[in-house]
From Swiss-Prot:
It comes from Enterobacteria phage T3 (Bacteriophage T3). The gene is 17.5. The lineage of its organism: Viruses, Duplodnaviria, Heunggongvirae, Uroviricota, Caudoviricetes. This is Holin. Accumulates harmlessly in the cytoplasmic membrane until it reaches a critical concentration that triggers the formation of micron-scale pores (holes) causing host cell membrane disruption and endolysin escape into the periplasmic space. Participates in determining the precise timing of host cell lysis. Participates with the endolysin and spanin proteins in the sequential events which lead to the programmed host cell lysis releasing the mature viral particles from the host cell. Homomultimer. Its main location: host cell. It is found in: Host cell inner membrane.
Length: 67
């Protein structure tokens, strides 16, 4: 007799369904695939981190020249 554990099978399928939904929704914004959105996020993160470091160095430089 075939017996299925519904909760266990649902948990196994959740990541697959989640990835599919994320991929479909990602393609709706500017037509980029999910993989391309990771590139966009990484580039944006790098630019923000460089900007934060530059601002931090400017603040340190202003404090040093004030004294």
């Amino acid at each position: 007799m075939l017996s299925l554990d519904f909760n266990n099978e649902l948990i196994k399928a959740a990541p697959i369904v989640g990835t599919g939904v994320a991929d479909v929704s990602a393609r709706r914004f500017f037509g980029l695939s999910l993989n391309e959105w990771f590139y966009v996020a990484r580039i944006a993160y790098t630019v923000v981190x460089i900007g934060a470091k530059v601002v931090d160095k400017i603040i340190d430089w202003k404090k040093a020249t004030k004294e």
